[in-house]
């Protein structure tokens, strides 16, 4: 992989310990008048980013380790670690990271003096963990070892399964915290590995012990806990239960009914100093949990992996609306036959998924008062998910988009997407872990003025990003954001946020695509 380094003397310092970058953040503040007029004030803030270069020895504990996603990502990482290969009818295959933005995407770093645009791997800009070096563990309500669970999932080619079987057969999930009130009753048949605790607080204590043992056994510096288990029903967030950290802890101690298993895992993770990622639709990340995470100085990330239909939708609707074309009606239909689909066949669990898939349009609709004037409704939008066992992990997504176009015209776009659900989700798990680990190593401070960044006495203390790590919204269907800040669902905007923050870490300006060097002849020689 090529080395990428910002030229010295441009506000960036590379040491063995850290990359320190002075950065001018140009933004705006807007005032809206009662008559609709808008006044925009440009603002420049002077920041200093510090990125620790030493990647932490990191483990990830997967909740739902024995499911399709958990076994697929574990098997894939073992294939990379042991450099496995496997034969298919089209030839011999090697392990890859297709679908991972950190491992398989590139980003522009600018133009050469000959006006050639240069792209580099995203992972080349700052030190990122090698996914094959992650230590994997976790919990599952099924006690089947990971090798047999991989075979049960029926996702990977049989020859690859056979090649990896011996690497996985001694991996066993820990007993899970399980409450049938929060998942479909049809999940009871595979629940043979349940934690034998008397109450919810005892479950939290056991989960904390599991995390400590995992960390100590594997000599880990960081542990990230990630939910990739079945979708829970929505919890009713109750004042006095979910609203503050202290209320939440007290509610768990008194065994409150409306505390879901996912909240127990998140609480245990946070209290053990681990960031928590919610890869499912349920509303785990209540106000009390976020306050608890802030208190312990860790991140929470959510909600729900954005892997297939919703990723396409968030990109396509953004594209059409940016073109001034009005979405009027969107009908989305899915069928799949894996255990995720089996669980979602229950109405309460489907409702959780419907909410996260349905909210993807909200901010884009509200952003365009020309297409959707105040008081008008957004596009008609419905979502259907059906369980058909025959198709297994090969999910079908069918979408019909209806648009209004120029002078009363109409346009219809129909998509049929066949994809293996877990092969799209597994790379997202990798990215969520890689980027969360990176953000553990990034701190930032604000300077008093443009020249103050060399004057340590005038700098406030370095701090991490906000507890709710909204930077990772690109990877999630229903991105959680800090309270009082806007939700962004547009796929391109989400992706650009990640890339531009990475650029900031090495002192580069945001990639705004102006490319004035190409449009103003007198700028062609600048920087030569």
From Swiss-Prot:
The keyword Transcription does not apply. It is found in: Cytoplasm, Cytosol. It catalyses: D-glucose 6-phosphate = 1D-myo-inositol 3-phosphate. Disruption phenotype: Inviable in the bloodstream form; viability is not restored by addition of extracellular myo-inositol. Levels of glycosylphosphatidylinositol (GPI) glycolipids are decreased. Disulfide bonds: none annotated. GO terms for molecular function: inositol-3-phosphate synthase activity. Its cofactor is NAD(+). GO terms for cellular component: cytosol; membrane. Gene3D superfamilies: Dihydrodipicolinate Reductase, domain 2, NAD(P)-binding Rossmann-like Domain. Its EC number is 5.5.1.4. Keywords: Cytoplasm, Inositol biosynthesis, Isomerase, Lipid biosynthesis, Lipid metabolism, NAD, Phospholipid biosynthesis, Phospholipid metabolism. GO terms for biological process: GPI anchor biosynthetic process; inositol biosynthetic process. NAD(+) binds at residues 66-69, 140, 187, 190, 228-231, 279, 304, 307, 338-340, 353, 392-393, 421-422. Activated by ammonium ions. Pathway: Polyol metabolism; myo-inositol biosynthesis; myo-inositol from D-glucose 6-phosphate: step 1/2. Key enzyme in myo-inositol biosynthesis pathway that catalyzes the conversion of glucose 6-phosphate to 1-myo-inositol 1-phosphate in a NAD-dependent manner. Rate-limiting enzyme in the synthesis of all inositol-containing compounds. De novo-synthesized myo-inositol is essential for incorporation into GPI (glycosylphosphatidylinositol) glycolipids in the bloodstream form. Belongs to the myo-inositol 1-phosphate synthase family. This is Inositol-3-phosphate synthase. It comes from Trypanosoma brucei brucei. The lineage of its organism: Eukaryota, Discoba, Euglenozoa, Kinetoplastea, Metakinetoplastina.
